[in-house]
Each structure stands twice: as structure tokens, then as C-alpha cells.
Amino acid sequence: MQQGQMAYDRAITVFSPDGRLFQVEYAREAVKKGSTALGIKFKDGVALISEKKVRSRLVEKTSLEKIQLIDDRVAAVTSGLVADARVLIDFARISDQQEKVTYGSLMNIENLVKRVADQMQQYTQYGGVRPYGVSIIFAGLDSIGPRLFDCDPAGTINEYKCVSIGAGKDQVTAYLEKEYKENLSEDEAIRMGIAALKSAVADESSMKEPEIASIKMGETFHVFTSEEVSKYLN
Amino acid sequence: MQQGQMAYDRAITVFSPDGRLFQVEYAREAVKKGSTALGIKFKDGVALISEKKVRSRLVEKTSLEKIQLIDDRVAAVTSGLVADARVLIDFARISDQQEKVTYGSLMNIENLVKRVADQMQQYTQYGGVRPYGVSIIFAGLDSIGPRLFDCDPAGTINEYKCVSIGAGKDQVTAYLEKEYKENLSEDEAIRMGIAALKSAVADESSMKEPEIASIKMGETFHVFTSEEVSKYLN
Amino acid sequence: MQQGQMAYDRAITVFSPDGRLFQVEYAREAVKKGSTALGIKFKDGVALISEKKVRSRLVEKTSLEKIQLIDDRVAAVTSGLVADARVLIDFARISDQQEKVTYGSLMNIENLVKRVADQMQQYTQYGGVRPYGVSIIFAGLDSIGPRLFDCDPAGTINEYKCVSIGAGKDQVTAYLEKEYKENLSEDEAIRMGIAALKSAVADESSMKEPEIASIKMGETFHVFTSEEVSKYLN
Amino acid sequence: MQQGQMAYDRAITVFSPDGRLFQVEYAREAVKKGSTALGIKFKDGVALISEKKVRSRLVEKTSLEKIQLIDDRVAAVTSGLVADARVLIDFARISDQQEKVTYGSLMNIENLVKRVADQMQQYTQYGGVRPYGVSIIFAGLDSIGPRLFDCDPAGTINEYKCVSIGAGKDQVTAYLEKEYKENLSEDEAIRMGIAALKSAVADESSMKEPEIASIKMGETFHVFTSEEVSKYLN
Amino acid sequence: MQQGQMAYDRAITVFSPDGRLFQVEYAREAVKKGSTALGIKFKDGVALISEKKVRSRLVEKTSLEKIQLIDDRVAAVTSGLVADARVLIDFARISDQQEKVTYGSLMNIENLVKRVADQMQQYTQYGGVRPYGVSIIFAGLDSIGPRLFDCDPAGTINEYKCVSIGAGKDQVTAYLEKEYKENLSEDEAIRMGIAALKSAVADESSMKEPEIASIKMGETFHVFTSEEVSKYLN
Amino acid sequence: MQQGQMAYDRAITVFSPDGRLFQVEYAREAVKKGSTALGIKFKDGVALISEKKVRSRLVEKTSLEKIQLIDDRVAAVTSGLVADARVLIDFARISDQQEKVTYGSLMNIENLVKRVADQMQQYTQYGGVRPYGVSIIFAGLDSIGPRLFDCDPAGTINEYKCVSIGAGKDQVTAYLEKEYKENLSEDEAIRMGIAALKSAVADESSMKEPEIASIKMGETFHVFTSEEVSKYLN
Amino acid sequence: MQQGQMAYDRAITVFSPDGRLFQVEYAREAVKKGSTALGIKFKDGVALISEKKVRSRLVEKTSLEKIQLIDDRVAAVTSGLVADARVLIDFARISDQQEKVTYGSLMNIENLVKRVADQMQQYTQYGGVRPYGVSIIFAGLDSIGPRLFDCDPAGTINEYKCVSIGAGKDQVTAYLEKEYKENLSEDEAIRMGIAALKSAVADESSMKEPEIASIKMGETFHVFTSEEVSKYLN
């Protein structure tokens, strides 16, 4: 690291001379240390798949779950600082419920993602706080059909056919860039997602029992049981 | 970079000895990394045209849209930090709707642009925040006729016959400075805009399907379909 | 620049050992980069004249207007940071209208200028903000007769027979110091002002179509049309 | 320690270039100096066991108690800065009682732990405060059955079959990782916990009279008397 | 300047090791650059006299007036930063009027001076602001008789028989220290004051038309006309 | 002191790399300069004893009193910064009275001590303040029986059979660690306390007339008169 | 001054490694530059005596008065920064009157002194302010009898038989330590006080007309006239 850089990267609210926000870039490093996950659309729905790092047999498995339901038609998977992620997921749930209480219907998924991303953007512009060290994939169904977004520490959001976050993001993306086709069946999509994750995750044990959840048109989000997951592992 | 400069460019609220605000200049660097877009007036209306960077085939195209409608007679295109841009566009929409609710009619376009620019100026004068890393072109129709403004990170606004922002701004401007004529037809203006963008954008792929939107006297803003766009590409 | 100076000029709220406020002096440098303008009193009124920098033929001329009406008996011309100037002009207009709503009559011009100058002074005394990088000439008519003030980044105001701001301030002042006489006719005053501006402005193009506005006893402020301006240019 | 590190670890709200929050890591060092404690689930309940450092015979033993009841179905044991721990335990009790007053029933244990952890997370993201220098084990019974969580200075929470905090955490965890079996009886679990603590605590005196508390299905939390504890010590 | 000093003089709220407040001392330097003025008591009243710096014939003379009426029995003359002085004079006028509205009578002069001085003292004790760069002489009549005070950037006030502020303060004071007698007539006092000012002011032009104002028992404050002033100039 | 330390010990809200809070440790140094005092329980009550430093015969003795009644069943003795101690004792008295007003009965002593300690803990966690430079011994009677606590600058509290604070704390504690027996009579306890203090206090004069106060079951706190004290001094 | 010290003495809210608050110590230096004053009790009352520095014959003597009445049974004399002293004396007067309005009787003198001292203590503990650079002697009569306190920049208060502040404090105290006897008559006490002051004040002129005020049982505070003072000067 050069001296010039150090002068700009310790104060969140300043630009470097070439227009970069170092603190946001460093927060992305925290995400790059996180577990790998992906979202993938199929013909009539969208699935989330995440590796599951079993650090110790003493940890309850439910405690390792990376996929979180926001409501019964939207789920999210996160990578990065665990506590930051929890706070943002709760923020999403509360925003969603407030909308329901106020307007009688749940939020459009894009608006829900924007609400979370706006919160994250503010932490990159105001002094006295640090950015959130987290990326989030949101997946779900709304009146437009299956939706799949990611949101990064800068508060930037994009919509995808498939998308990955975490340590193995680059390998997963390279795999899907090559293999992904539209109009996959749910089955094909999940098998492709698992193959993509396997190509990226060095630690085999964390792919022994990955997490899977999906939603299909006309249904609610379904988190796969161990039995359902195991069908996809050979 | 000289030591003298470093002393002044890390604290947003101070002037340098020669009266410059370095943080604002650095925010402009963030804009210079953004995608290139332009606005161009024609006889009875105004058009916006933007390159569309397709970074990956896995990204949904709607997610790359740079042109945003504020309401049915005003649209904007942005360049720079994507999350900052979203926040400012939402700010514009909310200001616009509040005016409508309060006074029963939409804001004059110039006032709408000033409202956004005042917000941006404040972030260059108060401590504890950074400037917005974004430039915006606003185009639309009001009682005066077709209007076309830009607004930069300093909060400066100008009205133009044609204007460009983003990485290719200088080349586009040089092209239009030479070629632009008043009283172009809509067709001529769009063809000239595309030619100008092509002269500036190195990556050919991002001009494969540029975004186009325009508004004509007596009509509302129209975002071109792929078919409509493709008519202009040869 | 000496090391001793650097220790004091980066924090707005401190005096240097010799009792100077460097940030205010640096803000004046921003004004010295601005376009040149002047105000000049004549027998029964007062006029404002400004060079008009036409940076590009693509910019709408109305967008370059430096002379702004506050209400129909007061106008202002500014030099320095464009966004700061807009914010202060709006501040003046709102103060003026609030007075009218509250007391049924417009503010005395001197009080209006003081209101703006007090705002500017506060930004030189409180931490967490920078001074406004702008000087303003206010001209108008009130019960005392024609009035002509300037206000600088320190918030200092003075009343003048004629006054100049911007890059050419020193030359314009030297010219008028020598030539100005009281009881000029409006015509004579405007011709003298244009001559003074021409003596100061290096870039001839920006004197091709200067801005002129004036007010006479019993009338309201009049912004000159291109035809009216052109009468004075030979 | 390298110079590069020192630049980032004195300001809580910034990330280091590799995405770490040094202040949170240093707060964990405060925890590593604390007394060793553990939580362990058994067939129909969960137990907490803590060493008891008797620094002086002049201290009242009740004052050394590390195990604290939140209400009659949840208890906690802490390690790290003693005053920080007291403040957080009180925070948990008040949150719990507010829930009871508001909704007529006590909080779900997981929600109670999240409430505390959210408080701890905020102290890692906002300026002007330091993180809490404390880790907490929460144990209890709710409608799901026996629950066992820990919460660290980052605000991260996990659910466990057994878990340890404090100076001897690594040795205790290694011991339990090897020995722990599910469906232990309460008796077996407590004996295993004491053996694990003994393997980790160098100062024998602090294992002379360890603290033990447990809860079984259908009962409330029971803090062991000296007599009950002594049964387990040979 | 020594390094030891620099460590203490850039932060207003700290004492130096020898108990000094450097920022207050530096603010006094700003006063030492101001125009010279004095107050002088005579048998049945008190007068204020100030040099009048005519920087340019283009400035309106009223704009150079240093003597300001607070109400018809109190006047003030200031030296130092012009905008700071205006803000404090307005503060005095508003305090005075508020008292009148609240209690039906104007403030005792000493209380009025204290109100201003308390304001100035606060700016020497709180962070985030700088001291006022101004000294003020207040003169007037109240139930005690003629009163004459000064107030400096520290917020210190004293009552005098005669007193001076500004660049020539030391010479004027030395002159009056030697010459002043009690029970002068108004005429004698004004002549002595002008002589004292002349002994201190290097630039003769600024003594061509000094400002004079005085108040006598049973009368209100009177600002001298040019004719009245000229009687005293030979 | 090493450079590494200096980097962490000037900002209260940060941990050092080894998990220490230097500002709290430095505040304890202020306590180590204070006068020595102790609390000691006996069979049916508790006593406080303090040396009394007579710095000058011109000081009123009442002004030197270190033992303060909170109410008639609780007293406290402090060591460290005198003004900080007064503020905290007043805080304890007000908390105590508020409880009485609100609930009709005085606070449980443990809760009273916690209220004060929580206040002290907050000053170790928030920016912009320093910790209190004081340790306090609280002694009294409540429904549990005689109580004896200390509270240090970290906000840590412990309950004791006997405890000491101030410059001689280590010697007093060593003495009592060796000599203290439970079920002492009040007389024996006070004699032992005085002997312990004498073993620790170098300046004999400050043990000429120590302060003593005690409370017995069924009675209120009694501050010993000079005559009562003198009985114990040979 | 050593480098180690400089690291701690520029930020008010931190302790130095040896538990000192440098800013408070530096504020005491400001007091040591102040005029010398003393308070002295006699048989049935208490007196205040202060040197009177006559810097110039042009200053009104009333303006130099150091002894201030708080109400008719309490007076104070200050040393240090004059503006700080005025603010604190006004604070005392207002606290006193508020008590009277609220409870129908004036404050107990000790409580009045504590109110002022608490204010001073806060300015030693919170960031963004500096301590008051002032020491105050309060003297008066209340139901206990004659009272005499001092209060220093740390907010520490003590009660005395006699006490001194300002530049000559050490010599005055040494003198009185040797000479003071209880049950002096008012006359003896004042003569002793003047002798003590004379022993300490180098500049004879400031002892030409010292200030004296006293209060006796059953009477109100009496400020001595010049004639009364002169009786004590030979």
C-alpha cells in the first residue's frame, strides 16, 4: 500500500483523487471472506443455494442457515459480517411488514431491495459510521414473475438471471456464464447451481449438505429438507 | 500529487489556497468513470441516449437501464456511482410528487432540477458528508417547451441544446459542437446522438443496443423498444 | 506557502497568529476566478452589467445569465462558485417574500443585503462548514433612492456609487475610480460600465453580448433585450 | 504490530484494507482474559458451568457469581469486562420484562439473544463508542426445547449443543469436541462440563467451587447450592 | 513561533501550559488591524470619535460609518472584522428591544454590555466556533449618568473615563493618559479626542472627516453632521 | 511508555491490541493518589474508617470529611478526584430519593450501587467524556443484612467482608487478608480497621483523628464524634 | 515540557498515564496570574479583602471591583479570567434567585457553592469545552453561622477559616498559617488580612486602596467605603 492511498482510506466520507471510496472497497473485502452462495432463475421460479460451513459438530445446524425468509414469497442469502447481515435482514423484514400494515399488501420485491440498498448507501456517505460489510442476494416472486437481485456494500443493486456472492463468487460466475441456459427446469437449475458451487468451494465438507430454497409460480418459498437436498448431491 | 495538495483535499469543508474544493473535483473523477450518455434537443422535443454496458449475459437487461422517468414528462440519465444516482433520482421523484400533492400540478422542470442541485450543493458545504459522485442529465417538456439540463457533483446546473456526461463526455461534446444544428427532426437528432456516442465509446459491445428515450410536444416521454432502437443502428 | 501558514489554514474556525481567517481568504480566490461584473449608479437609478462567458454554442443562453431579479425592484449579480451563488440568491428571494407575507411590504434593500450577509458571516465562524465561495452585487430602488451594495465571502457589506466583482475587479475599479462622475445619465453610465468591463476582460468573446439590467426612479427593474444591448456595443 | 495496522485500528468505524474491524478483534482480547465458562445441552435440558475465581477471602462469594438469571427460564454467563457484562445483562432483563408487559408473555429466547446482539452490533458500526468487551452464553427453555446461544463483541450469535467462552475456551471446546455425545443425562452433562473446565483452567483454586445452574423440561432454572455442587467435584 | 506554541493555539477550547488562550489572543490581532476609535466622557455626557478610512471615492460615505446607534441613548463604535461587528451590534439592538417589549423599559447600559460580552465569552469556551474578532466601545446615558464601556474578544468588559480601540489604541491611550482631565466641557472633550486620534493615525486622509457622536444629560444621542464635524478640524 | 501504547491511550473509546482500556487504567492512577479508607463488616453491622489529611490548620475540619451519608442507612467513602466524587455522591442521593418518591421506599443498596456504577461504566464507553477518577465504598443495612461494596472507575462493583481504596489500599488489604475474622464485635472491627490503616498510612498526622462511621442492625448510620473516635486511638 | 506530556495535555477529556488532567492544571495557571484576594473569618462574621490593580487612571474604579455581592448575605471574590468570572458570578446569582422563587427562601450557602462547583466540574469532564480559568472565594452567613469557601477550576470546594486565591496565594497562606487566631474581632481580622496581602503583593500601588467587605451576625454584607478602607491602611 502506498502512502498516497493511506491518506484517503481512513476517512469514510472523502473521495480519493481518482474518485474512489476506499472504505467501500475494504468492506467488499469482508464480503470476499464470506461463504459462497448463489441465486439462479428457472422457467417458472428462482432458487437460492449456499454452501454450509460446519465449523464444529457442537454448533446447531439451524444456527448455520444462510438462507433467510423475508416473507413467504421472498428469501435472502448473505455473505460477509454475520452480525451486519442479521441487522439488514431484520431491517428488510420490518420494512416489508410496515408496508403490509400501512397499505394492506406486501412490498414489490424491487422496492424492498431498494429500501435495504438505500440504507446501505447512506452508510457510505455520512461520517461517523462504517459501511455494512455484507452482500445480499434477494430472490422471490412478485407480479412481474421470478425476481433475483444482489446488493453490495456500496448500496448498488442489480437484477440477474443468476448471481453469486462470497469467497467463490468469481469461479461460480465463470461457471454459470459458460453453462447457464434460460428456461431450465427447477431440477436442472438446482443441479447446475450445485455444480457451480462445487467448482468454487475448496473445502469439500462445506458442500456435504448445502442449503437450498426455491419458489415456483403460484407457490410460496420452500426451504429444502435434508432428504430433499441429498437427492441433488450425486 | 504534491504535499501541498494533500493538506487540503482530505477535508471536504475547506478551500485550498487557490480557492478550489478538491473533494468536489475528486467526485467528478467518479463521474468520469461512468457510462457515457447525452441529451439532444430537436425541433419539437428532446431525446436522451445512453450506451448500455452489458457486463455479463447473466444480468437482466432492465437492470442496466440508465434512463429513468421522473414522471411522464421528465426523464433523467445518470453517470457515476450507481447507488448515489438511485438515491438522487428517488429524491427527484419524491420532490415532484410532493409538489403535485401540495399544489395540484407537477413542478416546473427548472425548479425540479434546482431542488436536486441544491441537495447536491449542500453535500459540498457541510462537514461529515461527502459530495454525491454523480452527474445527471434532465430532459423534458414544460410550458416553456423542450428543456435539457445537467447537474454535476458541485450542484452546478446549466441548460443546453445538447449535453453529454460520463467517460466519453469530451469526445461527444466535440462531435456535437461541430455537427449540431437547430431544428433537427427527431430522427436526425437521434441519429446524430448515436453517431456522437459511437465516436466516444471504445467498447463496441456497449453500443449494440443503446438506450433511447424522447418526448415530443403534446406527448409523454417514450422509452424506445428494442425494435425501435434497432432501426437507428445501421 | 510556509509551514506556519498550513497549520492555521485548514480549520475554518481558528485565527492565525496575526489575526487572519485563511479559509475566508481562500474563498475570495474562488471569487477571483469568476466572471467580471459591475454595478453603477446614475442620476435617477442604478445599472448592473456583466460579461457573458459563452463556453459553448451548445449551452442555452438563458442558462448563462448572471443577473438575477430578487423582486421587481432589486436585482443581483454574482461571481464565484455557481451553485453557492444560486443557493444565496434563493435565500435572498425567500427572505424577501417572507417579509412581504409577514409585514405586507417588501424588505428595505439594506436589510435584505444584511440578511444574506449574516448568513455568509455565520459560515465563517462555525465549525463543520466552509464559507460561501461567492461575492454578490445587489442593486435596487427603495425609499432612500437607488442603492448599490456588495457582499463578500466574509459577510462584509459596503454601499457604493459603483462597484465590481470577479476576475477583472481590480481593472474595472481602477477605470471607474478615474472616470466615474456623479449625475451621469443612464446612457452615460451604461456606456462607461461597458468600457470599464472591456478594459478588464481579456476574452473578447465574452463581451460580445454582455448582460445589462437597470432600474430608474418610479419604474421596475428592466433586463435589456439583445437589441437594447447591441445599441451600446459600438 | 506493523505500521500499516496502526493506521486502521484506532478508529472504530473504518475497515482495514483487508476488510477487518480491529477494534472488534481487540475487544475479543478482553474476553480472552475473562474467566472460563461453558454451556452444555442434555437430553431434556441445558446446564451452565463456570469457574469461580476467588481472588481474596475478603470478597463475598455472591459477588463472584458469573451465572445470572434473566428470568426463571433463561440464564446467562459472561466473560470479559465485568461492568460491560452487567450493563448488557440488565439490558436483557429489561427487554424481557418490556416484552412481558407489552405482550403478556416472555420473549422467545432467540429473540432475546438477538435484541442483545443487535445492541452489541451497533457499537461496532457507529463512531464515538467502543464495542462491548464481553461474550455471553445464554441458556434456557422455550417452546422449541432447550436452547443454548453465545454472543460475541461483534454481535454475532450462534446456537450450540455445547459452547465455551473466556480464557480456556479453546481447551474446553477441544475437550467437548472429542467427548460430547447427544442425549446425555443431566448428571453426565454436568460431569463432562466440569471435566472439560478442569482440563482448561490452570489455577486449581478456581475450580474448588465452580458455579452450576441448569434447567429441565417443565421446570425453572435452578442454581446449584454448595452441597449440590460438591457432589460433582470428585 | 515555537513548536510548543503551535501545539496549543489551533484548538480554541484548550489552555496552553501557562494558562493562555491563544485563539483569543489572535482574535485581538484582528482588532489591532481595525480603524482607531475612542470614547471620552465630559462633564454632563459622553462622546464617541472614530477615524473614517476612505478607501475609495466610489464607496458611499454612509457605508463607512463606524458609529452605530443601539437606541437613542446608547451608541457603539467597533474595530476589527466588519461582519462580526455587524452581527454583534444587531445582537445588542435585539437584546435591547426584547427587554423593552418584555419589561416596558430599555435595558440598563451595563446589562446590555454584559449581554453582548457573555455572547463573546461563550465563543471562547465552546468547541466548534471561533471567538469574535472585534472590540466594541459602548457609550450612553442611564440613571447613573454617562457610561462608557469597552468589550474585547475575550468577553472582558471595563468601564472608563476614556478608552480607545483599534490600530492606534496604544498611542491614543498614552495621549489621553497624559492630557485627560475630568469635568471637561463637551467641546473640550471632542477637541481632545480629535487631537488624540490625530496623534495615532498615520494616514492623514482618514482624519479629514472623522465621525463624532455625543450624548448630553437630558438629551438623546446626536450624530454630528459634516458641518458640525468640520468646526473641530482646525 | 512505549510508542505503541501512546497510540491507544489518548482516545477513550478504543481498545488497545491486547484488549485494555488505557483511560480507565489512568483514572485508577488518580484514585491511587487519594486518601486511604476502608470498610469492614462485623457481627451485626458494618463500619467505614478513613484517614483524615489535615493539609492546613486554616481548613475547616467538616470540609475534610470523606465519609458521606447517602441516607440514614447507607454511607459512602471516596478516594480520587474530589469534585468527581461529590458529583457521584449527589447522583447517588438523588437516585435514592427519586426511588423513595416513586415507590414509597428507599432503594435496595445493591441497586443503588449499580445505579452509580452504570453511570461510571457509560463514561468508559462513550466518546467526548473521560471516566470518573474516583473509587467509592458503599456500606449500609438492608433487608439482607449488612452490605459492603466498592465501585471503581471502570464501573466494576464487588461485595466484600472488608475492602480498601486509595493510596494505601494494597497494604490495608494485605493486613486484613491476614487478620480479618468473621463475627467480630463492632469494637474489634473498628480497632482492626484502625490498625490496618495505620499500617498503610505513612503520614502519621493524618491518623491523628481518623473518621469513623458505623451502622448496626436496627439502628441508623452513626458518624463518630471526636470523643468516640479518640477512644480507639491508643 | 516533555513529548510525553504534550500527547495528553491538548485534549481535555483524557487522563495522563499518571492520572492527571493537564487542562485543569493549566487553567490553574490562569488563576495564578490573577489578582490576590483572601477571605477571613472572625468571631461573629467573615470578611473579604482584595488588592485593587489600578492599571490606568482612565478606568472607572467601580469597574475594577473584584468583590461581588451574590445577595445581601453572600459575597464572592474571584481571580483569573475576568469574563469567565463574570459568567460564573451571574450563574450563582441566578441559581440563588431561582431557589428563592421556587422555595421562598435563599439557598444554603454550601448548596450555592456546590451548584457553581458542579458547573465547573462538568467543564473538566465533557469534550468540546475548556475548564473555567477562575477560582472563587464565597463568604457569607447562613443558619450555621459565618461560612467561607473556595472553589477552583477542577470544581473542588473546601471550607476555611481563612483562604487566599490569585498570584499571591502562597505568601498570603503562609502568613495566615503563622498568624491567624480564632475569635479575632472584625477589626483584628481585617488588619491581619491587609498585612497578609501586603506581604504578598509586589506592586505597592495595588494596595493603595484595597477592597474590603464583611458581614456580621444579624447584619447584611457591607462593602467598605473609601473612608472606611483608609482607616485600615496605616
UniProtKB/Swiss-Prot annotation, chains A, B, C, D, E, F, G:
Q: Where in the cell is it found?
A: Cytoplasm
Source species, domain of life: Archaea
Q: How is its activity regulated?
A: The formation of the proteasomal ATPase PAN-20S proteasome complex, via the docking of the C-termini of PAN into the intersubunit pockets in the alpha-rings, triggers opening of the gate for substrate entry. Interconversion between the open-gate and close-gate conformations leads to a dynamic regulation of the 20S proteasome proteolysis activity.
- Provide the GO MF annotations for this entry: threonine-type endopeptidase activity
Q: What keywords appear on the UniProt entry?
A: Cytoplasm, Proteasome
GO cellular component terms, semicolon-separated: cytoplasm; proteasome core complex, alpha-subunit complex
Its GO biological process annotations read:
proteasomal protein catabolic process; ubiquitin-dependent protein catabolic process
**SMART domains, per database record:** Proteasome_A_N (SM00948)
UniProt cross-references to SUPFAM superfamilies, sorted A to Z: N-terminal nucleophile aminohydrolases (Ntn hydrolases)
Give the main location: cytoplasm
Kindly give the InterPro entries that the UniProt entry links to this protein.
Ntn_hydrolases_N (IPR029055), Proteasome_alpha (IPR050115), Proteasome_alpha-type (IPR023332), Proteasome_asu_arc (IPR019982), Proteasome_asu_N (IPR000426), Proteasome_sua/b (IPR001353)
The protein's assembly and partners: The 20S proteasome core is composed of 14 alpha and 14 beta subunits that assemble into four stacked heptameric rings, resulting in a barrel-shaped structure. The two inner rings, each composed of seven catalytic beta subunits, are sandwiched by two outer rings, each composed of seven alpha subunits. The catalytic chamber with the active sites is on the inside of the barrel. Has a gated structure, the ends of the cylinder being occluded by the N-termini of the alpha-subunits. Is capped at one or both ends by the proteasome regulatory ATPase, PAN.
User: In which family does this protein belong, per the annotation?
Assistant: Belongs to the peptidase T1A family.
Instruction: Explain the purpose of this protein.
Output: Component of the proteasome core, a large protease complex with broad specificity involved in protein degradation.
Q: Write down what this protein is called.
A: Proteasome subunit alpha
Q: Which organism is it from?
A: Picrophilus torridus (strain ATCC 700027 / DSM 9790 / JCM 10055 / NBRC 100828 / KAW 2/3)
Q: What is the lineage of its organism?
A: Archaea, Methanobacteriati, Thermoplasmatota, Thermoplasmata, Thermoplasmatales
